[in-house]
Regions:
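Short amphipathic, positively biased membrane-proximal segments
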Residues: 1-187
Length: 187
């Protein structure tokens, strides 16, 4: 039995999505870290997550996107010392930004479900392979082998499921859906 229910405002949906995107990013990074460990990697999770990026040649794709955007706006070349902070900020910003978009869309639904995150993760994955080649940061999708694409898709599905589940939990908490005391665990 519901005692009270608060509606989700657009701003609350955006913030919930932003937070859910952070959780989804943690889930995706956990998936990738476990693959790294299975392949023989020895670093701790934090050392792996925040491994120094000493130059743009070592920067992951989110960092290269950030570099291209900043250099485009400022018309100045970013020095190598910015490779690590830009890559880290872009990675977490990208994950939380997509989560905010998820929050806006899922927040407009009557009853968003955690599994809605799966098609969301697939959409993020497919947009990466559509947009990043145009920016010169990825090869066209047909130039990747099936194993690389499958691993990357799986990581994005994990991201989507983590984002969808976190959004569902956050919005249930926000809306104040509770049960009557006699139905509570241990009552």
């Amino acid at each position: 039995m519901r005692i009270r229910e608060r509606s989700l405002t657009p701003v609350a949906a955006l913030v919930a999505g932003l937070l859910a995107g952070v959780v989804g990013t943690v889930c995706m990074d956990t998936f990738r870290y476990l693959a790294y460990r299975r392949a023989g990697g020895k670093d701790s999770p934090l050392a792996w997550e925040f491994a120094p990026v000493e130059s743009w040649a070592q920067a992951p794709d989110p960092g290269l996107v950030a570099k291209r955007v900043v250099e485009g706006f400022t018309q100045r070349e970013l020095p190598d010392r910015w490779a690590f902070p830009a890559s880290t900020a872009a990675h977490w910003g990208y994950g939380s930004g997509w989560g905010a978009l998820y929050g806006i869309v899922a927040g407009s639904l009557h009853d968003p479900r955690p599994l809605y995150g799966l098609p969301f993760g697939a959409a993020v994955w497919s947009s990466d392979y559509a947009v990043l080649p145009l920016a010169g940061l990825y090869k066209p999708i047909w130039e990747y082998d099936a194993k690389t694409l499958a691993t990357d898709l799986t990581g994005h599905l994990v991201y989507g499921l983590g984002t969808g589940t976190a959004f569902w939990l956050i919005t249930r908490w926000w809306s104040g859906v509770t049960r009557s005391p006699r139905c509570a665990p241990g009552a």
